[in-house]
């Protein structure tokens, strides 16, 4: 019987496996095993579904032990600004420090989450990339007044993203605005220099 931990949708089928303990056997999967180790994995775009999953895990892990760090691994192309801010607020709300680690890429909304980790506990692997840019929105239609409302909301989101990134990188909001006017792609070392992360992790594998 499955343990009920929902895995992200993917064409790659993750294996389940059987664990034995003093309480018997149980079927589990890699995501459930990571959760037991207080690790959350964001491996999809940032949307309402993934945001709700991540927020629920953050709150549960806080309840289990409010004094132990939580680690958020990120490999995401980004996504919804409102979903991003929901995760961001929860990361700042919970008592445990949230470590962030980029594997592969942290683009757009995911880059903000990477930067929002606890100070000194944000990292990236050597060949990962980080991309920051201004928030995007779907094409709008309607009367002039509707378009004005949408334009004001886009500008509000942009200012919020700029001040959020500025807070966590040490850059000014004005510099963030200049840098995100177009896509800004950073290597691991450049993300470190920019202040999005605090360290570039080396490989665990021993070099021969």
Curated annotation (Swiss-Prot):
Enzyme class: hydrolase
UniProt keyword annotation of Protease present: yes
Active site (UniProt): 108, 133
Keywords: Cytoplasm, Hydrolase, Protease, Serine protease
EC number: 3.4.21.92
Cited CDD domains: S14_ClpP_2 (cd07017)
Broad class of the protein's primary localization: cytoplasm
GO molecular function: ATP-dependent peptidase activity; ATPase binding; serine-type endopeptidase activity
Protein name according to UniProt: ATP-dependent Clp protease proteolytic subunit 1
Organism, as annotated: Corynebacterium glutamicum (strain ATCC 13032 / DSM 20300 / JCM 1318 / BCRC 11384 / CCUG 27702 / LMG 3730 / NBRC 12168 / NCIMB 10025 / NRRL B-2784 / 534)
Lineage: Bacteria, Bacillati, Actinomycetota, Actinomycetes, Mycobacteriales
